[in-house]
């Protein structure tokens, strides 16, 4: 779950 959230946040979900 951590990697999923990190990936989404880094994608541009700021």
Curated annotation (Swiss-Prot):
GO biological process: viral translational frameshifting
Protein origin, superkingdom: Viruses
Protein's name in the database: Protein 2B*
